[in-house]
Amino acid sequence: MFLFAVLALATAACSRQAPAPAPAAAPDTQTSADNGPDFGAVSVDIAPPKKKAVDIGKTTEWPEAKLESGKASISCSTDYVANGDGQAFTNLGFFSLLDVMLPCKEVGVVRLRYKGRVAGDLTTLIERVASMATRMGIKQRILDIDSSGGQVEDAIRAGDVMADTNWTMWVREGAVCHSACVLLLAGGDDRVISGAVGVHRIIRIQSEATSRAQLSAELHEVHDAMKDYLERNGASVAVADFMMTVPNQSLRILTPDELQAFGLIGRNAAQQDLERIRLVRRCGLDFVRREDAFHRAFEQQCAQPGQAVDAINACGLALRPHYGFPDKKCLDDGPLAELDAQAKAAAEAAEDNGDADLPIATQ
């Protein structure tokens, strides 16, 4: 009974919203779709994945795999302006990833930069980086993506992997997340978006339909799968319906208000509900109230359309002290904790040297 009362107080605190900022000028939301080989958002007949004979979390003998649908690199820094995007790699074997990610173990953060199509090897990439991060105790994981789309079924699988392994997702300035990539946003615990996010209708490249009715029947199953996926991951099922209204040759860029309404930006609602109970127990009601207040201010003051991701992060870091963060009691659970990893490593090193002052992350 005490816990339910505590949660009720926390929910009531969240309902008191600060005044919304003045609306920004309406952006140009209509453009042409990428005419690449995947047509942006493709549905194909893919055999269900076989039950895995190897649990990659319990062995070093991973099945051979190579990244072919895009370019990936690993960085142990969130400051991409100063430090770039890290070390590139294509081999997804155990020891290859071990070598690339080992420097991130001490820092406690891994940023996976990916530029390319949404395909089956992207799912493998995310799954294996997450598995290696778990082995190394790296809790802060960022998928820094730039993708014009790919296969819907693979996007759903990759998004579910992300949801199970706690990723923050970035769409940086100059990057895009179009078509099937948009589904990945639902899988992130938190989404920081500066680049363009766009949707359009799914195309069945293996379709034998000769009428709109036949094509509609073929798309119905994948449309329902998209809705189920969006619902279980805290996004609005209206995203799937909206996609079907935009011709495949066109691209509808989502506005910040639409991203918010569809549950594709900021904190993931489903993950937030899941974490709230744990946070109240572990960090206390005051912590949860301060975190909620911070995120309301962050969304209004920092996450503005057109801002670069590094500027959004810098704004959030400057805002945190006003709400008592970082909180020494729950360093790994506070807002923008992924940006604290390097500062935390420095703090632990300082403590070993007899200086216990806690540095605050800055950019």
Which sequence ranges carry the predicted segments?
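Small-residue-centered hinge/linker elements
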Residues: 19-20, 27-139, 148-150, 194-237, ...
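Bacterial N-terminal signal peptides
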Residues: 2-11
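Low-complexity, Gly/Ser/Thr/Pro-rich intrinsically disordered linker/tail segments
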Residues: 272-363
